[in-house]
Amino acid sequence: MNNTVSEFSCQLDDLTVTEAMGEALGAQLKAGDLVILTGALGAGKTTLTQSLGVGLNVREGIISPTFVLARQHPSLGDGPGLIHVDAYRLKDHDDVDTLDLESTLADSVTVVEWGLGKVEHLTDSRLEIQLDREALAAPVGNPWEEAEEELDEPRLFSLKAIGPRWNEDAFAQLKDSLLSAVAAQRTEEKHV
């Protein structure tokens, strides 16, 4: 097994840049890809998944699957569908296996929020994405008193690509696409 690991990080200035990143990411993914999202509440995991769905061209209506654990979003075109999982309440591999993600993995892109340490056994290649608002934000008030405007704060996007699917060429193409989307969104915002 090829355990190629490549990494990069960049700042996402606000939610529109986060959305541009997600859309570019979705456009690069294909059936069989596994994406593990990590970050505190309000870090932008669901926002990133929603825009990733736009890039994949799947049916709208992506919301956090907190209470149902997994939601399926079919493709509107020729591409793969999206399986969106919230693994927060799942304890381990056994709990994950009850969702039977193996049966949809080959035909879909699978995005798992809170999945680190729980879903890596599903495939030998994956993307691990960490979204962190705290790394860039100045301390403000009480964390439980989160104002709506604080949701639009900058966040640090860190991506780790693991396995043979993300060889040097595939990773370089992914990274270039993501950074180009961020740069284009920043340029657009400057001209508005």
Language-model segments: what does each one mean?
Residues 2-24:
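N-terminal pre-Walker A segment at the start of P-loop NTPase domains
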Residues 61-66, 71-116:
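Conserved nucleotide-sensing/catalytic segment adjacent to the nucleotide-binding pocket
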Residues 26-31:
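Phosphate-binding P-loop
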Residues 2, 6-8, 102-192:
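Short phosphate-coordinating micro-motif centered on Lys-Gly-acidic
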Residues 38-40:
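P-loop (Walker A) phosphate-binding loop of NTP-binding proteins
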Residues 45:
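Conserved lysine of the Walker
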Residues 34-36:
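Short hydrophobic/aromatic beta-strand immediately N-terminal to the Walker A/P-loop
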